[in-house]
Amino acid sequence: MLLTLPDILSPQDLQAARQLLIDAPWADGRDSAGAQARQVKNNAQLPHDCEAARAIGTMVVGGLERSALFLTAALPKKIFTPRINRYSGAANHYGNHVDSAIRTMAGSGQRVRTDVSCTVFLSEPDDYEGGELTIADTYGEQRIKLPAGHAVLYPGTSLHQVQPVTRGQRLACFFWVESLVRGNEQRRLLFDMDMALMQLRQEHGESQATVALTGAYHNLLRMWADT
């Protein structure tokens, strides 16, 4: 399931994030990549424990917690510490790859299964050329380039890449979610069911039918969830 999440960051959040990034200590993004990813990764990335990365990560997680769409789509159990990257100049692309299945959070050593990937855009589309997040799915190749503050969710199993940035700079926050429901097909079914229930309630109010369907939703979640 590929899903756009609008306005995860407010204009005030974005202004604060950009101010934090002015003097940020950028490092080679390949330093945090595995052996295979190193061969295709060419960008800059903030150390996870620097002030700018921590502050922006806190803003992003706060925005996610306020997003009903994120909560129902991702069904989050754990959120990997958000990272910040930059594509510009010679360090301007990330070739085709699939994210590692398990990531370990620095400091705590806690492991996170990467069921869902998420990118929050920090730059406006007009600020740079190229830089599309390109995701291969069952419907073909999807090219994603969203307004600043918007996010995209997609399965962690997806083959994806970031196209070369040929002008300007592309700033983004990225992270992974371990879901209560690890299977993409099951998450999609639960998401579709929840969205349909919301629409039924808006159009017809609560009824015996919506109560029964809500029960079915929770019984499926109970069957599939890993807490």
Curated annotation (Swiss-Prot):
Fe cation binds at residues 97, 99, 160. Residues 78-179 form the Fe2OG dioxygenase domain. Binds 1 Fe(2+) ion per subunit. 2-oxoglutarate binds at residue 170. Keywords: Dioxygenase, Iron, Metal-binding, Oxidoreductase, Vitamin C. GO terms for biological process: DNA damage response; intracellular iron ion homeostasis. GO terms for molecular function: 2-oxoglutarate-dependent dioxygenase activity; iron ion binding; L-ascorbic acid binding. Pfam families: 2OG-FeII_Oxy_3 (PF13640), PKHD_C (PF18331). Its EC number is 1.14.11.-. Its cofactor is Fe(2+); L-ascorbate. The keyword Secreted does not apply. This is PKHD-type hydroxylase Bpro_3048. The lineage of its organism: Bacteria, Pseudomonadati, Pseudomonadota, Betaproteobacteria, Burkholderiales.
